[in-house]
Swiss-Prot record:
Protein name: Large ribosomal subunit protein eL43
NCBIfam families: eL43_euk_arch (TIGR00280), PRK03976.1 (NF003058)
Cofactor-binding details, from the entry: Binds 1 zinc ion per subunit.
Cited InterPro entries: Ribosomal_eL37/eL43 (IPR011331), Ribosomal_eL43 (IPR002674), Ribosomal_protein_eL43 (IPR050522), Ribosomal_zn-bd (IPR011332)
Record text on subunit structure and interactions: Part of the 50S ribosomal subunit.
Binding site for Zn(2+): 38, 41, 56, 59
Gene3D superfamilies: 2.20.25.30
Cofactor needs: Zn(2+)
Entry's family note: Belongs to the eukaryotic ribosomal protein eL43 family. Putative zinc-binding subfamily.
């Protein structure tokens, strides 16, 4: 239990990889595992089902997005310039 206080779920790696890498992984994992708002139905039910694949648990809408987030910062810029 003592090894997960600073790095929470990244504590499963134990002392391996160093503290900085485990903290970085913790931030990435928090973004990856949270729920996002669906573009189609508007519910906060979008979860990651695979690498770059996102699925709404409410309406079943499945789409491709970023690896860790459904919409990447670069994708937002492209949407602004196109749309």
């Amino acid at each position: 239990m003592g090894r997960t206080k600073k790095v929470r779920s990244a504590g499963r790696f134990g002392p391996r990889y160093g503290l900085r890498v485990r903290r970085t992984w913790l931030e990435i994992e928090a973004v990856q595992r949270q729920k996002y708002v669906c573009k189609k139905c508007g519910k906060k039910a979008v979860k990651r089902s695979g690498t770059g694949i996102w699925e709404c648990r409410h309406c079943g809408y499945k789409f491709a997005g970023g690896c860790y987030q459904p919409v990447t910062p670069g994708g937002k810029i492209v949407e602004k310039s196109v749309g």
